[in-house]
Every structure is written in C-alpha cells, then in structure tokens.
Amino acid sequence: MRIQLPIIRTNSDSHPGGRSALTCRFRCGDACFHEVPNTTTNPYVGDVIADAVSRRTTLRAAAVVTAAAAVGGAATVAAPQADAAVAAGAATTERTGTFSRGARGLRFNPVAPNKNDVVTVADGYGQNIVIRWGEPILNGAPAFDPDNQTAKAQAGQFGYNCDYMAVLDMPHERHQQVLVINHEYTDEVLMFAGYDAANPTREQAEIAWAAHGLSVLVAAEDRRSGKLTAITRHRLNRRVTATTPFEVTGPAAGSELLRTSADPAGKRVLGTLNNCGGGITPWGTVLSGEENFNQYFGNAEKVTDPTTAARLKRYGISGGASERKWERFDKRFDVAQEPNETNRFGWVVEIDPFDPESTPRKLTALGRFKHEAAEPRLTDDGRPVLYMGDDERFDYFYKFVSSKRMMKGTSRAAREHNRTLLDEGTLYVAKFIGDSPAAEIDGSGKLPEDGEFDGRGEWIPLASGNKSYVEGMTAEEVYVFTRLAADKVGATKMDRPEDVEPSPRTGRVYIALTNNKDRGAAGKAPADEANPRNANKHGQILELAEGWNDPAADHFSWRLFLVCGDPEDPSTYFGGFPKDQVSPISCPDNITFDAYGNLWISTDGNALGSNDGLFGVATAGSRRGEVKQFLTVPLGAETCGPIVQDRRVLVAVQHPGELDGASVEKPASAWPDGPGKLVRPSVVAVWRKDGCDIGV
C-alpha cells in the first residue's frame, strides 16, 4: 500500500461546528442533517416567568453549594464533605469544604489556536504515545499490519477511535494503572485502502465489529517522568467488541421489547456499539454509554407497523440501507427482519476491569437513549446517583437514584451486592426554568438584567422498578423508549447535553452542551435561558446545584458557567472573568476535574477555525471563568476522554486526519508516525518536565 504525503485540507461544507462531512458520516450517520427526532412542543426554559423577580430573590437567599461525595475521572472517590449552605455566588471558605478549599487557578502559558499536525502542549510539558489503534494487547495477537488486517487480529488489538478513558489504581502495584478505553466508531475510508462504500466486504465488516467496543489494558509509569507505557499481554488486558456477549439486567430484562429470534428470552445481547462518555463507580467498575447506535441499522423504511415505525423514528432510525451495510452480513442489523434488535442498544454498559472473565452488562434501569455520560455521586447514606445526557439536538438531561446503599470494601459479598445497585432505583428527567422575563432572552446571547443566565429546576420521575409515573406507558416502555416518556412529562429540550461531571470538591454538577445549529430555526425550539443563543455554533457549560446539598433531591438551582465562542463575540460569557484574558473555546464535549477543583474541557468540532484542544478553567475564586488552552490535537482530530491527575494528563486523540477528501491513499494527516504511515487514533500522556503538579 502506497501512502502519499498528507494534503492539508480545510472544511468548507456546511456541517455544524468545525466537523468534516467525513466525521459526520461515520460518527453519527449525519444526525444533524436528518429531521430532529424530538418533534414535541414541550415547554422551554424561560416559558414559565410568572413571579420572576420574587422567585429570583427567594432562590438567592436559599441557594446551596452541594458538598457530597463525587467520582472524578480517576479511580479515587472523594470522601463526603461537610454540608454548606451559602448564597449563590458568595465567597466560600475552607471551613465549608467548598470551592475555595485548596482551589488554585491555572498557571501555564496557554497554547495559541493553531492548525498544527501534531499534539501541541503548553511550554514546559512533555508527551508520549501510550497506545495506537491496532497495537496488540492480548496474548497471541499479532503486530498491526495495515495491509493484512483481519477480524481475528483486531479482536486482540487496541480498537479504533478511542474516546472515554477511565484510570484505576492497580492493586499492590504502585507504578501500574488499569486503563479502560472505549472505541466510539470506525471510519472505513481511513482504515481500508480502496474502500468501496457501496460494496464493503464481510471481512471489512467483521474487522469493524472487532474495532468497536472497549479495551482494558495495564500501563506502567516511568518513575522519573510522567511517561506511561502500555503493558501488552497483561493478565488483566481484555477486548470487548460488537460481538461480545452482554447480560441484560434491571427492570426491562426479559421484556418482550428486547426479545429477538436469536435471543427469545431478551436477556443476552451480542456486543456494544458507539460507546462515548462514561464513568467510574465507587465500587470499581466502569460505565460506558452507547450513543449513536441508530446508524448501524438498515431497512427501517420496510417496517409497516405504525407504532414500531414511530418508535424507531424517535430514535433516529429511518430510511433504507445503513452506511456500513452490516445488514448484508448479519440480519440482526436489518430492522425489517429484527425490529427489536435496535432496542438492545442505547444503554449504559458496565464492565469489571479486574475480572477479565466477567460478563459485561447492559443496565436497563438507567433508560435507553443516546447516552453520552454516566457520572456517579453518592448520597450521604451511600446510595449512588448517576447523571446522564442524551446527545441529540433538543433532547434531555437525566439522573438515576439507586434505592440501595453501597457496601464498602472489596469482599466477594460487597462486590456481588454492589453490582446490583444500578438495577433498582428511580429514573428522572430534568425540567429547567429560567428566572428572567422572556423579553430579556432574545436569542442573541445578551445577558439578562440580573447579569447571569440562571434559574431553578425540578426532577420529574419517570419510573421506579415496575412502577411507571408516565401516563399511558408501562414501566418497561419507559425504560426502553425513555425519550418518548420524557416527551410526555414536559422535560426541557437542551442543546445536545453531552458529558456531565460532578465537582469532587463541591458536588456541583457541570453539563457540557456542545452546540445546536437548529436552536431558534423556523418551527424549532426558540432560545431560552439555559440555551440562550439561536443557531448555537459554540455551545455552553451549565452549572447545577442540587437542593439541600442532596444529589437525590427533587429540585435544583442552575446557572450558565460558560457561554463559549470567540471572546470578542458579545454573546460569549466566561463566568464573569474579563473576556480579553481568556482562550477562545468552541464546542465543549468531555469534561473532568483536577484535584484543585479546576474544570478541564475537551472540544469536538471547533467552529472557530482551529484544531480541537483541551482547556482548563478555574471554577471558583478570583480566576473563576479564566479559560486557558492546555493543548491542541492534530489536524482533523477530536480531543476525547481527558484524565487530569496530579502528575499526568491523558487524552484520546480520536479520528486524526478525518477531513473531507481524505483516504488511506491520500491522507490529510501524518500523525502519529510521520509521512508514509497510516494515520492512527491513539492515546497520549502529557506531563510536566519539572515533575510538579499539572496546570498549577
């Protein structure tokens, strides 16, 4: 195979943000260019404005800063902190255990926007590649050979398009860590020379099945630097693919809605697809959300039952042949033959990284939609609470509150008990209510008179166990068709809620709302206080504080922390920080926290003409809102799955070189191995050369 030198391209098409048409084609099946699945007339934030002034006064007198336990991007779990009730925006103290306790701003020199075809890091930092697509991680797996790929080889090699990453401490091994990394999607044009989209081969399809899923691998730390190196063929290393058996658990397990000809019991599913954001549970398992699963299924237009067709359409499943044509090689991807197979995707999956023989699970109590995140917290009495976004234009934000308490320890009894915690509880959807008069929210992004986009909200219950709270729907229907249930109860339409992260210091929950080109368009939802800009190209980050400092509360307060874009754009807002002192940022996607309470944001589809990157921002103190760019990824790439530890940052560099017109033979990037080599998604570690903590 002859690979030419990379040809630098720009994207001049009309795709949203800065994404290429190639990315949209393979990642989400051109979701933004299909009809919006949510066609309801649900109320929007800002519609309820009666008594706005008095409500604002009441809220500000009683607002709280949450201080419950939280789980971040690393394996450790913060201890429960003391409750603190403070006025919104008021200074907090070390005594309260909230924002200012140990909080620091970020002290590196920001990286300038660029179009470099490398990972560009802040001055004083080093980097190395931890693992590339195709590198062997299992015993017997061969070295990667781009000209001789096979499904068998790929099943033992690191998967394609790395996204979410979890890092857990290796028991009894101080300088080793367990990495769990999921693989969102495949781009066959950049994987296979001479790929014919109209006539893919069975081998290409089976390689793609093996390149999806998750990888579990152990990595070793260099004690003299922050370098991290994958340990190939470690006993804990594992691949989970699109053909790995999964157990279905929770209240919808065995439902008629999940039964197929291959699985008449409705309790065993082959594989997981389009994994995106996730989370680490306090008991040491890893969660991963199935997102744009709809694109893998073909022939929905042949479904004649109107109820089934309407349900499929609400999940974006329509039309004829799928992009990858998998229905030609396995009938489960043919909706006309197996209409229930689609219902077996769109779940949060759970995997035990310390037991390579365990069966991964699909958790039906958490609802079915395009899951982007599954971030846990603990209540004071030890019940896990999960926050989840549905990454679609005008879809919703959810949480799940378990009815069972976590058992501490790592005994067999504790592990068996804790693996049931996410099967029993209550599923909720959020309704956001603004506190400003409607006339002050005009779609321009101009701040209302009170100086903030803020308000209150409530959690609307959908189902608990076998009980449905949604009129006209059974509990099983609520879990399997969660979008339809949320439609019925009047949940708030959001601008693509993606990653969610509770602060380990305060418990406040941060939600990345990536963008929404259709906000305010004719016949579409208008701007509201939580989504204040029409044709929202750049996105925003919302900050949510649960009532009474309790993650299980039925109400909350909220405010927009960042309204992203070019600082010179009058519609942007950076937590009140001077806009001439921040880095431009567009399309926030994955988020995480460091130990000092700083929020780190990776971007997807930068609409400002620069490469995507990783940004840090203080969430408290005098530097709250000071956004600083820490790194950029190569041409065409997205920054995914950031993990910020004291001495190391990990980022997944997804779809490098995925620019319009690119192919294996005519690449748009030479990363990571230089000209003449195949472009390969990879994981990168970054560290401070002086050995000090990252960012501060």
Show which residues each predicted segment covers.
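Blade-edge beta-strand/turn elements of extracellular beta-propeller
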Residues: 116-132, 140-153, 224-266, 351-368, ...
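Loop/turn-rich, solvent-exposed surfaces of beta-rich toroidal or solenoidal domains
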Residues: 580-620
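Blade-level signature of beta-propeller repeat domains, shared across WD40, Kelch, NHL, RCC1
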Residues: 646-696
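Signature of short aromatic-glycine-proline-rich micro-motifs recurring in repeat-based ectodomains
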Residues: 153-167, 264-277, 488-499, 577-592, ...
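Beta-propeller blade signature
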Residues: 212-219, 344-353, 401, 537-547, ...
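N-terminal secretory signal peptides
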Residues: 1-53
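N-terminal export signals
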Residues: 51, 57-83
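Short, conserved, GDST-rich strand-edge loop motifs in beta-rich repeat architectures
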Residues: 184-208, 294-339, 402-405, 515-536, ...
